[in-house]
Every structure is written in structure tokens, then in C-alpha cells.
């Protein structure tokens, strides 16, 4: 039963990630994440893209690239929120 509770926790994490992407990210932002991971995005609806991103990010073999992507996105957000540096970062 220990394995079962671990599976439930992971399912909760996956659901939380899907909810976060759905509530807090635009389709354009999700397209950028998919591009970074080289996930094909042609003709995919937002929900389909979210599902693929979450599956990708929860695959242990993608741990390093996922952490790097999250760190770089955090840096972009920080730069974007800085009055001086935001002038040099152009995010459309």
C-alpha cells in the first residue's frame, strides 16, 4: 500500500501542475514552454498542450531540463519586474 500512496501523491502533483498551467498561463506562454522542450504543438488545444507538458515534466529523465527551464523562466520574470533591466528584455 506504500506504493499506492506514492502514486496518489504523484497524481496530486500532476493535477496541481495541470491546474496551474490552465489557470495561470496563456496558450502563447504554453507554446513557448513546448518549444523549449521540443514538444510538437501543431493544432493542439490548450488542454492537450498542458497534458503533454506535464507528462514531459514528470518524466524523471527530463528532470534537469525541466528544472533549468523553470529557473530560466523565473529569471525572465524577475528581469521583467525590474524597472531598469526590463528595458533590455523584450518578451512579446
Residue ranges, per PLM feature:
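Basic helix-extension-helix modules of the SAP/HeH family
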Residues: 2-92
Amino acid at each position: 500500500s506504500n506504493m499506492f500512496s506514492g502514486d496518489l501523491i504523484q497524481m496530486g502533483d500532476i493535477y496541481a501542475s495541470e491546474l496551474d498551467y490552465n489557470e495561470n498561463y496563456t496558450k502563447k506562454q504554453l507554446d513557448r514552454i513546448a518549444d523549449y522542450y521540443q514538444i510538437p504543438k501543431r493544432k493542439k488545444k490548450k488542454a492537450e498542450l498542458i497534458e503533454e507538458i506535464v507528462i514531459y515534466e514528470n518524466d524523471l529523465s527530463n528532470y534537469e531540463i525541466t528544472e533549468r527551464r523553470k529557473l530560466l523562466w523565473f529569471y525572465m520574470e524577475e528581469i521583467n519586474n525590474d524597472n531598469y533591466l526590463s528595458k533590455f528584455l523584450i518578451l512579446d
